[in-house]
From Swiss-Prot:
Identification of the protein by name: Probable 1,4-beta-D-glucan cellobiohydrolase C
Taxonomic lineage of the native organism: Eukaryota, Fungi, Dikarya, Ascomycota, Pezizomycotina
GO biological process: cellulose catabolic process
Active site residues according to the UniProt entry: D180, D226, D405
Thr-rich linker as annotated region, ranges: 59-90
Disulfide bonds: C27-C44, C38-C54, C181-C240, C372-C419
Domain of life: Eukaryota
Amino acid sequence: MKHLASSIALTLLLPAVQAQQTVWGQCGGQGWSGPTNCVAGAACSTLNPYYAQCIPGATATSTTLSTTTTTQTTTKPTTTGPTTSAPTVTASGNPFSGYQLYANPYYSSEVHTLAMPSLPSSLQPKASAVAEVPSFVWLDVAAKVPTMGTYLADIQAKNKAGASPPIAGIFVVYDLPDRDCAALASNGEYSIANNGVANYKAYIDAIRAQLVKYSDVHTILVIEPDSLANLVTNLNVAKCANAQSAYLECVDYALKQLNLPNVAMYLDAGHAGWLGWPANLGPAATLFAKVYTDAGSPAALRGLATNVANYNAWSLSTCPSYTQGDPNCDEKKYINAMAPLLKNAGFDAHFIMDTSRNGVQPTKQSAWGDWCNVIGTGFGVRPSTNTGDPLQDAFVWIKPGGESDGTSNSSSARYDAHCGYSDALQPAPEAGTWFQAYFEQLLTNANPSF
């Protein structure tokens, strides 16, 4: 369940060696100086501001969430005066209803420039389709926050140009000091011992500034994967025990500062195999409800995000053997067991679930806690509000499929033993860097298929 800033310096500048670009070649995007015309039978399709591609007989498309009957109320943005005086979008009900989600340009560029060149021709159209699926942008280092502004500006421009339905921004806030306290693969940039709490608050302030600047852009945030769940089950780990007060202070600060009219937030809540056990449900609900009330019951905190970067099913008729007797063996059972406890404690929460890598069920995990680059997985259900459960706001893609969970190199400083298990695909690169074999696995096993 790991994600870390990639060290790969992506470049979208490819050599112009012919007047017309071949099928699947790049034909446009910011900074592109090569061919802009495609060979006969292909059309130059703009996938994002940074990348256009020659696709056979295709035109650019946007992915729209199919919506439920829950209504979304917005104030229409004006077409003048961008930036600090932008009109404010306000939301009520399901924050996904009535919006299409933003396709992550960075992930799209990874797919097109890293994955597709080495894929067999039969998989290239499928990979191109994956690049168009909206996935969350991870703000896993402070240096990425300005890029958030770039994306919000792009969304603002598209919405003013008449995007219908309007586009919502989707981001993961993920930079706690002493991050990933119970594992090693995704340790972050801040240390509690080295001014980490103050640095984190500055990071949150920078995110808030972007959200205020683009107050006419509806934005959905997932807050700190793997943080509060560790405070439920892993306080026996010294690093987690030492981080407890800092985690709570930092998450409280984030919830208060990002409680804005144009924002909807979901706190990370692990998954069924972590907090869904009967012994963990009560303590988890108590913690989440206390965090909610301590932050002043922020209106923007819609609920909890589950299965982030994990592989669990939404609903199973039979519990797999690796769930080891947990009655809440899928995410639907988990949230329906958790929700009443939260409500009784004053937090009327709704949920979202990451389905980016849960297309194959049952999984090939040897144990339910095996989280690193699990073999045999596939892309799952595309983003949708058609969940069939009033507690579940949406299925979404939070983890960018194809980015590694962690390295299998045991000599690495960030090596975690889970990444060397027999059910982890190997050899694997560092967390957050591109893992071509894993992307191909997800693509080949996608359910529904591309």
